[in-house]
């Protein structure tokens, strides 16, 4: 490379070449939801257009067809799935699963479901910055005992936000 530069540009050119040692190949990270076949996100740039209703109806329809279904209410700032599934009074709890404390999803209509709405009072405003909301969402995904699922439905918040970025960076949406 140095000879070519001097031949075609000028002999007076000073060439400094820095090389970098190749990084060792890193092991492929473990998938976050290894027992889930399909991950479907229901989203829209606008609020109030029926995302939560579509997500709930999709989950119920798939469950009625015999599929194993999980639903995550990822709308951290306006969770509505607990009400739609008549689970407003559900109290989340954890159990030891394979030596790790895991959150156990609520279950209704043969659908496993988690929502941030289970952890906050309905009339309480969520004043979380992006990182806090994203970390809460990651925990609802990775630290829950979802078991084997055919479909994992994500009810996303309106717009594009840190939540959406977290979802696409954390799990392979089908």
What are these regions (language model features)?
Residues 39-75:
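Walker A/P-loop phosphate-binding motif and the immediately C-terminal alpha-helix
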Residues 67, 172-174:
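Short glycine-/polar-rich loops that comprise or flank the Walker A/P-loop
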Residues 5, 36, 47, 73, ...:
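Residue-level signature of catalytic and energy-coupling elements of molecular machines
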Residues 1-43, 90:
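Extreme N-terminal, non-catalytic leader segments
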Residues 68-123, 128, 134:
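Phosphate-binding loop that captures ATP/GTP phosphates
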Residues 118-170:
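Phosphate-binding/switch loop-helix module in NTP-utilizing enzymes
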Residues 48-57, 79-80, 156-164:
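Short glycine/serine/threonine-rich phosphate/pyrophosphate-binding segments
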Residues 111-112, 150, 174:
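Conserved acidic residues
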């Amino acid at each position: 490379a140095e000879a070519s530069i001097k031949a075609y540009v000028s002999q007076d050119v000073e060439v400094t070449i820095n090389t970098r040692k190749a990084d060792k190949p890193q092991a492929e990270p473990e998938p976050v939801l290894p027992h889930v076949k399909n991950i479907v996100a229901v989203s829209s740039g606008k609020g109030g257009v029926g995302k939560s209703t579509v997500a709930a109806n999709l989950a119920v329809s798939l469950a009625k067809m015999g599929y194993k279904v999980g639903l995550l209410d990822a709308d951290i700032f306006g969770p509505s799935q607990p009400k739609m599934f008549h689970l407003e009074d559900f109290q989340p709890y954890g159990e030891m699963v394979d030596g790790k404390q895991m959150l156990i999803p609520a279950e209704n209509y043969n659908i496993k479901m988690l929502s941030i709405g289970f952890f906050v009072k309905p009339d309480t405003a969520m004043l979380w910055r992006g990182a806090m909301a994203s970390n809460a969402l990651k925990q609802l995904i990775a630290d829950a005992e979802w078991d084997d699922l055919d479909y994992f439905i994500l009810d996303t918040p309106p717009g594009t936000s840190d939540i959406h970025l977290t979802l696409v960076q954390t799990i392979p949406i089908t």
